[in-house]
Amino acid sequence: MNPNRSVAVDKVVVHMGVGEAGDKLVNAERIISEITGNTPVRSVAKQTLPAFGIRKGAPISCRVTLRGEAAEKFLETSIKIVENKINSRAFDKQGNFSFGIEEHTDYPGQSYDPKVGIFGLDVTVVLKRNGVRIARRHIQQKKLPLKQLVTVEDAKLFLKDRYNVEVQ
């Protein structure tokens, strides 16, 4: 197989939305940094939602972006937690996919603490092929050929071959 046609993991984004600032967000940041080993970044609300008590610009969630070997290792652990099954509706047109994990206590080394509670998290995986750099570089930037884009079928085949995942 042509090495430029092979699919690889570009990045894994781990997101915890808590809906409010304060102790709950601080606890979520601590948990996400323990699980991933990286420092989280806070995300702010894009609009005001009075029904939920959220103001525009208020920090309401945190996320971590993993790349390289750390992303692959975290993805393996996360896929085992969801029992090697991903819904077919989890894929977008570019071959990226997302899935949720209901309890952070499913990860190794995490235990339930009544003071903290239980947090769920979202895992988003972005896939790429070699040669994507020509579309992202600043000097002599080119359009990416359509055959170089990752399709949904390519992503499903990659998951089946690499991580033994069943797409439902």
Curated annotation (Swiss-Prot):
InterPro entries assigned: Ribosomal_uL5 (IPR002132), Ribosomal_uL5_arc (IPR022804), Ribosomal_uL5_C (IPR031309), Ribosomal_uL5_dom_sf (IPR022803), Ribosomal_uL5_N (IPR031310)
Keyword annotations: Ribonucleoprotein, Ribosomal protein, RNA-binding, rRNA-binding, tRNA-binding
Record Gene3D superfamilies: 3.30.1440.10
A Pfam family reported for this protein in Swiss-Prot or TrEMBL: Ribosomal_L5
Protein's GO biological process: translation
Cellular component GO terms held in the UniProt record: ribonucleoprotein complex; ribosome
Function as written in the Swiss-Prot or TrEMBL entry: This is one of the proteins that bind and probably mediate the attachment of the 5S RNA into the large ribosomal subunit, where it forms part of the central protuberance. In the 70S ribosome it contacts protein S13 of the 30S subunit (bridge B1b), connecting the 2 subunits; this bridge is implicated in subunit movement. May contact the P site tRNA; the 5S rRNA and some of its associated proteins might help stabilize positioning of ribosome-bound tRNAs.
Annotated protein name in UniProt: Large ribosomal subunit protein uL5
Organism, scientific name: Methanospirillum hungatei JF-1 (strain ATCC 27890 / DSM 864 / NBRC 100397 / JF-1)
